[in-house]
Amino acid sequence: MAKGIREKIKLVSSAGTGHFYTTTKNKRTKPEKMELKKYDPVVRQHVIYKEAKIK
């Protein structure tokens, strides 16, 4: 069976709350670090989430 090219990543809140989302991304088409604006329920507002490796 073929190995998928999508890699699991963690999106960590830049607000410093420790909240994170997990998702996958295609390493071949998007080699740069991902940054998304998503909702952080701890601070109850939308903040920037930055990509980090899943350990």
UniProtKB/Swiss-Prot annotation:
Pfam families the UniProt entry points to: Ribosomal_L33 (PF00471)
PROSITE patterns: RIBOSOMAL_L33
Single Gene Ontology BP annotation: translation
Keywords: Ribonucleoprotein, Ribosomal protein
GO cellular component: cytosolic large ribosomal subunit
UniProt keyword Ribosomal protein, yes or no: yes
Similarity section: Belongs to the bacterial ribosomal protein bL33 family.
PANTHER family to which the protein is assigned, alphabetical: 54S RIBOSOMAL PROTEIN L39, MITOCHONDRIAL, LARGE RIBOSOMAL SUBUNIT PROTEIN BL33M
Protein name listed in UniProt: Large ribosomal subunit protein bL33
Organism: Klebsiella pneumoniae subsp. pneumoniae (strain ATCC 700721 / MGH 78578)
Lineage: Bacteria, Pseudomonadati, Pseudomonadota, Gammaproteobacteria, Enterobacterales
